[in-house]
Amino acid sequence: MEEIGHHFGLGATAHGQHHSQLPWGSSPLSAVISPPPQQQQQHQQQSAGYLAHSPLSLNTAPPGVSHGGGSGCSNPVLQLANGSLLEACAKAAKEPSSSSYAADVEAIKAKIISHPHYSSLLAAYLDCQKVGAPPEVSARLTAVAQDLELRQRTALGGLGTATEPELDQFMEAYHEMLVKYREELTRPLQEAMEFLRRVETQLNSLSISGRSLRNILSTGSSEEDQEGSGGETELPEIDAHGVDQELKHHLLKKYSGYLSSLKQELSKKKKKGKLPKEARQQLLSWWEMHYKWPYPSESQKVALAESTGLDLKQINNWFINQRKRHWKPTDEMQFVMMDAYHPPNAAFYMDGHFVNDSGLYRFG
């Protein structure tokens, strides 16, 4: 009986009590999907003799087995296993050397394969295997199952499909068990997916209202490119596309101040570096022309700022640093600078000019 239980996923104790097993490697389907031997005429004759002399009945039980012993008897599959469908195989198991044992087992396999519900039973088994599998694996399983079923049915084309209520009930019960098993396997995955959706919803509620986290991540890079362009501090243009336009208005209204301050900081960092080459060249030219007195007036500073594209602060800082590093006033220049701070001599100091004994003198 243990060998028969191995083929049908059922184990038997020494006292005749059965318990359910579900190892898919040794399940009835794993035995069914293996190609049957080529001795089909012998199987058909033995199957016909088996049906004629051993009518199937769900209400009969093998000797020594009570329906009330053990909690496993409430399982419909176990109740079917206790019937005379497997009783003949159990009797044959007493003589392992007999050739009728293997023939009866193969005959039962052939009946299951040729049964009208075999397709749904095989599909239910594959559904259990597909739980959590990648799409490409599921597609391969389906293709292999279809090809295998076609070859098996072709090999058993001569076997008739007689009506057997007990076998029908067995197929339906096993199919129902596989469906329930698939539901148990699928439930944890469904709970995990529901948890992920709930977390995503919470993250979306914490972020911008009405905008999904995926949209924020997808559009974040383009907005950063616009901010890092280094041009004018104007806000990016808004495309008129319904809901997206409202979301962009909301974003600009909420973060415009932050973006403006960020752009100003970026522009300051750029200005702290070296001045453009052309601007430095113009400042050096003015420096060489006015080396004796490198103090540009306010109007000259404005003109230099316009021609170089710099601001007045940059112009002042450049001349201060240039004078500290590369200019040393002569004695006459020091005298002029000292007299410029005394009121009696203030009349002699003008914009880039001063008057000495020989008359009006201009530096540069």
Swiss-Prot record:
A GO MF label: DNA binding
Major place of residence: nucleus
One Gene Ontology cellular component annotation held by this UniProt entry: nucleus
Gene3D superfamilies for the chain: Homeodomain-like (1.10.10.60)
InterPro entries membership: ELK_dom (IPR005539), HD (IPR001356), Homeobox_CS (IPR017970), Homeodomain-like_sf (IPR009057), KN_HD (IPR008422), KNOX1 (IPR005540), KNOX2 (IPR005541), TALE_homeobox (IPR050224)
Tissue and organ distribution: The unit of inflorescence is the spikelet, which bears a fertile tract, the lemma, and the floret consisting of palea, two lodicules, three stamens and the pistil. The lemma is completed by the awn, an appendage homologous to the laminae of normal leaves. Expressed in the inflorescences and lemmas and at lower levels, in palea and vascular bundles.
Keywords noted in UniProt: DNA-binding, Homeobox, Nucleus
DNA-binding stretch(es), residue numbering of this chain: 267-330
Start-end of Polar residues biased regions: 19-29
CDD domains tied to this protein: homeodomain
Domain ELK: from-to ranges: 246-266
Described function: May play a role in meristem formation and/or maintenance. Overexpression causes the hooded phenotype characterized by the appearance of an extra flower of inverse polarity on the lemma. Binds to the DNA sequence 5'-TGAC-3'.
PANTHER family: HOMEOBOX PROTEIN TRANSCRIPTION FACTORS
Subunit structure: Binds DNA as a monomer.
Name of the molecule in the record: Homeobox protein KNOX3
Species: Hordeum vulgare
